[in-house]
Curated annotation (Swiss-Prot):
The keyword Ribosomal protein does not apply. UDP-N-acetyl-alpha-D-glucosamine binds at R92, R121, P122, I123, D124, L125, D306, I328. Keywords: Cell cycle, Cell division, Cell shape, Cell wall biogenesis/degradation, Cytoplasm, Peptidoglycan synthesis, Pyruvate, Transferase. This strain of S.pneumoniae has no heteroresistance to fosfomycin unlike other strains of this bacterium in which MurA1 is required for heteroresistance along with other as yet unknown factor(s). Heteroresistance is the ability of a clonal population to grow one or several subpopulations at a frequency of 10(-7) to 10(-3) in the presence of a higher antibiotic concentration than that predicted to be effective by measurement of the minimum inhibitory concentration (MIC). Its EC number is 2.5.1.7. This is UDP-N-acetylglucosamine 1-carboxyvinyltransferase. Phosphoenolpyruvate binds at K22, N23. It comes from Streptococcus pneumoniae (strain Hungary19A-6). It is found in: Cytoplasm. One of its GO terms (molecular function) is UDP-N-acetylglucosamine 1-carboxyvinyltransferase activity. Belongs to the EPSP synthase family. MurA subfamily. SUPFAM superfamilies: EPT/RTPC-like (SSF55205).
Amino acid sequence: MRKIVINGGLPLQGEITISGAKNSVVALIPAIILADDVVTLDCVPDISDVASLVEIMELMGATVKRYDDVLEIDPRGVQNIPMPYGKINSLRASYYFYGSLLGRFGEATVGLPGGCDLGPRPIDLHLKAFEAMGATASYEGDNMKLSAKDTGLHGASIYMDTVSVGATINTMIAAVKANGRTIIENAAREPEIIDVATLLNNMGAHIRGAGTNIIIIDGVERLHGTRHQVIPDRIEAGTYISLAAAVGKGIRINNVLYEHLEGFIAKLEEMGVRMTVSEDSIFVEEQSNLKAINIKTAPYPGFATDLQQPLTPLLLRANGRGTIVDTIYEKRVNHVFELAKMDADISTTNGHILYTGGRDLRGTSVKATDLRAGAALVIAGLMAEGKTEITNIEFILRGYSDIIEKLRNLGADIRLVED
């Protein structure tokens, strides 16, 4: 079992370059199944979720080549084989294979999605959309079987009962080769949705309105190959901005799109964080006299649920008390118990996180309970005096490309250890 060991309390300086967006690429790769020629992705992050998706694509018959941050996928040999639960249960994003296999073959048998345990994340919205387009859905143990083999998928008007990034993207993927027009109302607006729509349009799809709450898709018969650059990972960027404000003596974060982080940066400015924003980078100064604030997550363009955990250690540096409420994932509080082991003044009650800043953290043994909780513990370990050991680190490696190397380059005493 591997663990991350950190000797904290060191000031960090330098530059970090943000990788391609995890939450985009995990949808882009399954979407490539719809193409009838080679698709090349640039700026692909080196994370375990990508490695798992590549393995699945190769099992299905795709030819995949990877060099540096470039991924070249030839989907012409893909066969519609069942993908049982055991092979894909580590991936929340495995549900994107539902849309792509339905779109290409008219049927799919795929294991139910896994990923981080953050509370109820039902796929009902996905199934409702597929059924509106003419598919049938049935559970077979831990697998989902979908079929539109007899009639094919057709366009439909679909209203999302709740705003859902995954369901919006999956519906787009399924609809691009459906017969007729599909309209998605109350669609999610995240940048990753625009990124997936851009890839599909570059492959020959007809999608309008991505990034708004109404998306219109006119089905086409075929999609061709293309080359596409993955957008920068706004969650990775927000994580390193939080880290820079917590322990930095001046850190520049490169390959950042400010417009994707406006809600997050507004809250940092409310705290008193000093930073300079330029065209594609953010320079975070050394901080002092930070103010405690309240955080409430919301769908984009609000404060991202994926950033409330990485921000928490910085909040613990601030003066005063505050609350954090995650309206998206009710169980996104497990990092609280681990931070408390590090002597943080933090607790949770009825889904609300209550914290008081200003107390020094101390290193100890903690466990990453999910991806973003793991990021929070890394930041806390860098802040703390003494040694911090983080176990269950596979969660962290799922979503943060080259995290050990990037932090070492800033001067961190951090290493990956085989236990």
